[in-house]
A protein has these predicted regions:
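Glycine-rich active-site/cofactor-binding loop and its immediate structural neighborhood
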Residues: 1
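Catalytic core of soluble alpha/beta enzymes
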Residues: 5-153, 158-159
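Flexible C-terminal active-site loop/helix
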Residues: 153-204
Length: 204
């Protein structure tokens, strides 16, 4: 029910923007009328992942203007890593929630991103170690910044590890009392069903 949409398509910045706008228009039209009981609005939240492809704030704002034009803006729950981590842009004036992911390697990095205006943190308890993840979650909590879990296409056992972290996070803004966990292993592992069978309680 939480629609992850990859943006930042190949090409020049102008070509990328045009492709991203067209992709958003197509997806938004295809999902027209879809509803979920898990969001406050009842509509499907959109989660954009840019992987640092946007070079300038102005380009991202043009995408958001397009989202407003087609009626998709209110459904954008977050945009993850729109800019390269070395491109230290103040984002306080961007009117949607931006999330730090790859750029938040440590708790100190997370604090820096929060000070730059980022309003969410992606936790990766496997990639960034559980101990560092707890430190990042702590500083984010202290500053009132919500977190969610992303799993890097891990196996079923490690999905459970992430669930344990996600279950202890506060509700993500816009959701009805729910934490947020991204998992996509079932879409990428050929033998996912077999891998699940190794779990002592695969249907839990």
């Amino acid at each position: 029910f939480f629609m992850k949409i990859k943006i930042g398509q190949p090409g020049t910045q102008q070509e990328m923007l045009e492709k991203d706008m067209a992709r958003l228009s197509a997806i938004h039209a295809a999902l027209d009328g879809c509803r979920t009981p898990y969001s406050v609005s009842g509509k499907l939240p959109y989660y954009f992942d840019a992987n640092g492809r946007y070079e300038k704030k102005e380009t991202l704002l043009r995408l958001l203007d397009h989202a407003k034009k087609i009626g998709a803006f209110e459904q954008i729950a977050l945009i993850e890593e729109p800019f390269d981590e070395e491109n230290e842009i103040d984002v306080h004036d961007i009117p949607v929630r931006l999330a730090a992911d790859e750029s938040a390697h440590t708790d100190k990095d997370a604090v820096k991103r929060i000070e730059m205006g980022y309003r969410a943190i992606a936790l990766k308890a496997i990639a960034k170690t559980l101990s560092m993840t707890m430190k990042i979650a702590r500083v984010a909590h202290d500053k009132g910044v919500p977190c969610f879990c992303a799993d890097l296409t891990v196996n079923p056992i490690l999905v459970e590890w992430n669930k344990c972290v996600a279950a202890r996070l506060g509700s993500f803004p816009g959701l009805e009392g729910l934490g947020l966990l991204e998992t996509n292993g079932h879409q990428n592992y050929k033998n996912w069903a077999t891998m699940r069978s190794y779990h002592p309680h695969p249907d839990a």
